[in-house]
C-alpha cells in the first residue's frame, strides 16, 4: 500500500538517523571549540528544509528517497529500540553542540552530500522530521483503534 504503518514511520526515521547522526558526530569532532557560541542563526536553505518538514494541520505528502522508504521491509519491535537509542544519541549530540558555533559548523544533507547546511539547521531538520512522522504513526494507531471500536 501507499501509506506506512506505525512501525514503517519509525523505521523511516531510523534510516534518516543512520545518515545524520554519524554526520553530526563527524562535524562536531572537526569543529573548533567555541566557548561563547552565542545565538544560532538559521541559513536560508536550512530554514527552508526545516520549515518544510514541520508537521502541519493538513500534512503535505512528500516523496521519500527509495533508500529511506521502509515500505515492505520485514520489521519488528526492534525498530523501536533502535529509534529510542537514536533519540538518546541525538540528545547527547545536542548537548555536545553547546560548545561549538552551530551557525558555522556545516553538515552534509541526504539530498546531496555537497549540499551542506549549518549544524543548528540540521538539528531542526532531524527533530522536525521526527515530529512529523511520530504524529503520522500516532494517526495510524488512532485510526486502527477507531476501526476496532
Question: Where are these predicted regions, by residue range?
Answer:
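Acidic/histidine-rich alpha-helical segments that form the ligand environment
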Residues: 46-102
Amino acid at each position: 500500500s501507499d501509506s506506512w504503518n506505525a512501525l514503517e514511520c519509525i523505521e523511516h526515521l531510523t534510516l534518516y538517523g543512520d545518515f545524520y547522526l554519524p554526520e553530526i558526530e563527524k562535524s562536531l569532532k572537526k569543529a573548533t571549540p567555541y566557548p561563547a557560541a552565542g545565538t544560532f542563526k538559521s541559513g536560508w536553505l536550512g530554514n527552508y528544509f526545516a520549515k518544510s518538514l514541520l508537521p502541519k494541520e493538513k500534512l503535505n505528502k512528500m516523496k521519500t528517497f527509495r533508500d529511506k522508504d521502509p515500505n515492505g521491509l520485514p520489521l519488528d519491535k526492534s525498530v523501536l529500540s533502535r529509534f529510542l537509542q537514536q533519540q538518546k544519541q541525538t540528545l547527547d549530540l545536542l548537548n555536545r553542540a553547546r560548545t561549538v558555533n552551530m551557525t558555522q559548523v556545516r553538515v552534509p544533507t541526504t539530498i546531496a552530500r555537497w549540499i551542506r547546511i549549518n549544524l543548528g539547521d540540521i538539528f531542526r531538520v532531524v527533530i522536525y522530521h521526527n515530529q512529523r512522522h511520530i504524529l503520522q504513526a500516532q494517526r495510524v494507531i488512532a485510526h486502527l483503534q477507531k476501526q476496532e471500536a
